[in-house]
Amino acid sequence: GFPHFDYVNPGAPKGGVLRMAVVANGFDTFNPFVIRGVAAAGINTYLYDTLMEPSADEPFSAYGLIAESIETPEDRSYVTFHLRDEARFQDGEPITAKDVKFSFDVLTTKGHPFYRNYYADVSEVIIEDERTIRFEFGDTNNRELPLILGQLPVLPSHYWKDREFGDNGLTPPVGSGPYRISDFEAGRSITFKRVEDYWARNIGVRKGRYNFDEIHYDYYKDDTVALESFRAGNFDFRVESSAKNWATAYTGNQFDSGK
């Protein structure tokens, strides 16, 4: 382990609200893993943890998140993940190897076809014990497979046991990540609230991150309207890809004051 990523402030204060904008025609599901429907922004990022966490300042490297340690032989014929004892879903249930296998199985059979293709080189998934799971590889030429498996979002098998995976709609699901859905207006806005007792808050790959108490997204159908809303101070961050806008649109008190 390590104390924290070099690019974060481990003592960063927590609080406040981050207001964001999405330019799209709304959303109709909280399930980003299936082909049907349009998922709300932020679900993957804030609601679900993965086995490993990528580093933002290294080329395709990752460190354990739900997985405490990872084993793979020289020939990369398999990868074994040992899960952290403290890993929990947001309802307090422990994250186990059963949940990891369920996630792999449901994503590759009922999820978006992307997952079936992405994990096509996995030949077998073996639960060794409650906290240990091994993925066997049929093709060992892809040296990145252990890292690819590390990107697997882990879903709660107990939550989905009596639910149809493709029919979640707008029922806020149980996740394992640093935020949960606290409020939404169908197709128009969604608010995430920080989980104060988030299980991974003191783990190196998470320390100093996810500091806002709330993250709020408003939806705009038109980018021009979104830009005017930003100019009016209605949200806090915008990615600009238009040279014309960059040169001419960001003027006025909100910008000249340096705030």
Give the location of each predicted region.
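Aromatic- and charge-enriched surface segment that lines or borders ligand/interaction sites
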Residues: V8-P13, F33-G42, S69-P113, E128, ...
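Short, well-ordered beta-strand elements
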Residues: G15-A24, E68, Y78-F81, V100-S103, ...
